[in-house]
């Protein structure tokens, strides 16, 4: 069975594992999911990620990050642009998540970028995939 929205599936798996205080979460891998994991690691929301060979295809395993008292590094994840309703942002109107405390993940012509990275590159807007805070 094909998956309609792999990014939403990834975010749901992360959200569920995070709320259950799991140390790792696994899912089918793709280039888009790998790039989202790279962004989450660079922004400090996850500890690490790795791709492993599975019986069919590849598997993406993400190590979640917790504080010294088991506080979650990810407070929330929200899918914005969905298959039924795409959401786009111009370079002049990029979203701000929680007044700059969170990030928006954008799919641009320059690849996947955060809203801060897209703001630094003049004239880059794109599809708003998700908010992370």
UniProtKB/Swiss-Prot annotation:
The keyword Ribosomal protein applies. GO terms for biological process: translation. One of its GO terms (cellular component) is ribosome. One of its GO terms (molecular function) is structural constituent of ribosome. It holds the Pfam family Ribosomal_S8. Keywords: Ribonucleoprotein, Ribosomal protein, RNA-binding, rRNA-binding. The keyword Transcription regulation does not apply. InterPro entries: Ribosomal_uS8, Ribosomal_uS8_CS, Ribosomal_uS8_sf. One of the primary rRNA binding proteins, it binds directly to 16S rRNA central domain where it helps coordinate assembly of the platform of the 30S subunit. Belongs to the universal ribosomal protein uS8 family. Part of the 30S ribosomal subunit. Contacts proteins S5 and S12. NCBIfam families: PRK00136.1 (NF001109). This is Small ribosomal subunit protein uS8. It comes from Micrococcus luteus. The gene is rpsH.
């Amino acid at each position: 069975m094909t998956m309609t929205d792999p990014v939403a599936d990834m975010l749901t798996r992360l959200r569920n594992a995070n709320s259950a205080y799991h140390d790792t979460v696994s899912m089918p891998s793709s280039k888009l999911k790998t790039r989202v994991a790279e962004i989450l690691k660079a922004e400090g929301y996850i500890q690490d990620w790795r791709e492993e060979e599975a019986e069919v295809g590849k598997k993406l395993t993400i190590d979640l990050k917790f504080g010294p008292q088991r506080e979650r590094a990810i407070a929330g994840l929200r899918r914005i642009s969905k298959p039924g309703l795409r959401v786009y942002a111009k370079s002049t109107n990029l979203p701000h998540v929680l007044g700059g405390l969170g990030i928006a993940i954008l799919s641009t012509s320059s690849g996947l970028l955060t809203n801060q990275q897209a703001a630094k590159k003049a004239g880059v807007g794109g599809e708003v995939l998700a908010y992370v805070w």
